[in-house]
Amino acid sequence: LVPAVQSGQVDCVIAGQSITKERQQMVDFTDPYYYASIITLVKNDGDYKDAASVEDLKGATVTSQQNTIWHDSCLPQIPDGNILPAQESAPAMLVALEAGKCDAVVTDMPTGKAACVAYPDFKLLDFTGTDGEFEVSDEDINIGISLKKGNDELKDAINGVLSEMTEDDFNKMMDEAISVQPLSES
């Protein structure tokens, strides 16, 4: 995504990108439009279906999508977790869970909700707000729109629109995106 923005192939990217210091060296970002909730997906009939905390995932074989904080920061927090290589895409990650190659995947709430629609045998586990949640920084979970460095006109225009939106507006947009997101590779 970053190379497409840098090269001018696209003007901006709205794709759940965390606003990290590393990415900010390569592209500019709008103000955050979303703060991601980290969730875990398991199979309804799997060994970890009753997990109520990260600790309860002890020993699980897990994966997530490449180039995400879910894979880089969250999976290592699972005690004795068997961390598989990062998956190329959200659909690939979900297919790994569906096929039994892993016990759980860690991702964000919108991806998790969409996955449960595409895969009814998945269960969404949300440890947010409990003592057993994944430990992340605000930088890890603040989501913004990336654009080419120095494109202040576009950045200001997007920030102007974002500043007028309410939490309900954002939630409605997220729900609409979830309803049309093609997460199944079948």
Regions found by a protein language model. Give the residues of each.
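Proline/Glycine/Serine-rich low-complexity intrinsically disordered segments
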Residues: 1-186
